[in-house]
């Protein structure tokens, strides 16, 4: 029986963190969960998956969008009466815990999985960064946008991620003390970064 392993990846937008997470999943034969968690949470909760997507890693979404997003709710009096951002977070947390319990190896991208699974001894928590200009270039290439648009997308997106993470974890998003390992992916490239993290994981577990 192989050893259980859970890899939680936090990442700056445009850093290549999601790609590296997929490479690590292949390296360690793990199941990969990014937006897939939203689908599982939607099935468990009775909410539409679109609602989880629009609320994904954003704090305060419900306060500003409550009135115009109600059609995205599934047809359930229970969930309508218990409707709050905390309830969405709880459904998502339950989905992450269930996946971690049901699989011997998995990789989670974002969504405070490192905090949700903080009592699990099989976790390795990694945060992936890159210089702003590198991330802007990556976002421009991926989305076909201007540098100014890419910078705005990064700054707005990371502001939301930080608020979300800090609120639910009482830790600080992107700060070294919140993770086992932080690494700048621009130094070694995607494959090299994956190799370094993989070596760290083998030594760590």
Predicted regions and their residues:
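Conserved phosphate-donor/acceptor-positioning beta-strand/loop module used by diverse small-molecule
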Residues: 119-143, 147-157
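ATP-dependent small-molecule kinase phosphotransfer cores
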Residues: 42-105
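Short beta-strand-centered segment that lines the nucleotide-binding/catalytic pocket of NTP-utilizing
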Residues: 31-42
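Pre-Walker A (Motif I) flank of P-loop NTPase domains
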Residues: 3-12, 104
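Small-molecule kinase domains that catalyze NTP-dependent phosphoryl transfer to phosphate-bearing small molecules
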Residues: 62-71, 146-190
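RNA pseudouridine synthases
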Residues: 99, 106, 116-119, 138
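Glycine-rich phosphate-binding P-loop
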Residues: 9-22
């Amino acid at each position: 029986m192989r050893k259980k392993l859970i890899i939680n990846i936090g990442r700056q937008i445009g850093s290549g963190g999601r790609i590296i997470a997929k490479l690590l999943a292949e390296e360690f034969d793990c199941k990969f969960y990014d937006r897939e968690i939203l689908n599982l949470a939607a099935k468990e909760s009775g909410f539409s998956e679109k609602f989880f997507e629009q609320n994904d890693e954003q704090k305060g979404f419900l306060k500003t969008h409550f009135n115009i997003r109600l059609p995205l709710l599934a047809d359930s009096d229970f969930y309508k009466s218990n409707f709050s951002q905390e309830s969405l977070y709880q459904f998502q947390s339950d989905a992450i815990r269930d996946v971690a319990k049901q699989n011997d190896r998995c990789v989670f991208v974002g969504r405070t999985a490192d905090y949700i699974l903080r009592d699990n001894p099989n976790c390795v928590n990694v945060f992936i960064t890159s210089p702003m200009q590198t991330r802007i270039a990556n976002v421009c290439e991926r989305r076909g946008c201007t540098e100014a648009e890419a910078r705005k997308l990064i700054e707005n997106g990371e502001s939301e991620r930080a608020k979300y993470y800090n609120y639910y974890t009482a830790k600080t998003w992107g700060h070294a003390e919140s993770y086992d390992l932080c690494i700048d992916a621009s130094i070694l490239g995607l494959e090299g970064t994956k190799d370094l993290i993989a070596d760290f994981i083998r030594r760590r577990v």
